[in-house]
């Protein structure tokens, strides 16, 4: 049986470029445990240029092969690609559209599902349409006096708000606001990251995460895990990834009533199926002191760094990551 030529594409053009390289390390290590795959790791830089781990400049062609700038090297045919890219152009759905165009099978959610989840406004509209509770919000499409006034009114009404760039990941362009004097400046900063901004009511709640993935034809939702930050903080980019982070994670959240845990998992599966996600996702919830469940966001290519929850929750659920990848990839290629 011939090996599968698997392109592990990582990097990308977002603020999460370096994080995706860490996630790619985990994928590379997991894939190396199987004898089925020839893996070529290629980094997509912030300017759209491709380079192998060995430093060879290259490109992915419409003929589904890696072509090297050094023409003495033979092109490398690609059977399958894992776009391990957090943020643009991976989780935004852009690169999946290209894969679809050249008919290259790939791991993860398809283009439309990725785009719908990455845009926080679109995602919340989907959550509501599916009947899944989520945080109160308003959205803004330009930075002007009216936007400032609407945000001031939201702050007065809700007491505390989050101002978020609508199309960024990992808490990039996300600001907690309690002081009305900071509204204008924060809005300006948020619009610097995206053309649309969402303003959400601050929810005092536990932050729970569920790994949701396809396994042998079934959609699996793990028990909720939990992110625990210092009091009066939220899970910022630095809290997620900095070595000095004081946040901690529990692979299985403690003291969550069984019926609440099951409802969270049911909502997670409903969101996965309803938004037509594929292969994997991490779905994040708030759980208030009154046991109110609110869907926060969906990550269509969750991190797989040493501190990331998705691989830990999958393993805790009894599934091996290498076996999981092999099942998905082989099943997809067999269906071609």
UniProtKB/Swiss-Prot annotation:
Gene name in the database record: ddl
Pathway, per record: Cell wall biogenesis; peptidoglycan biosynthesis
Entry protein name: D-alanine--D-alanine ligase
Residues annotated as domain ATP-grasp: 124-330
Enzyme category, top tier: ligase
Binding-site residues, ATP: 154-209
Alphabetical list of HAMAP family matching this protein: Dala_Dala_lig (MF_00047)
One term of GO molecular function: ATP binding
Protein species of origin: Shewanella sp. (strain MR-4)
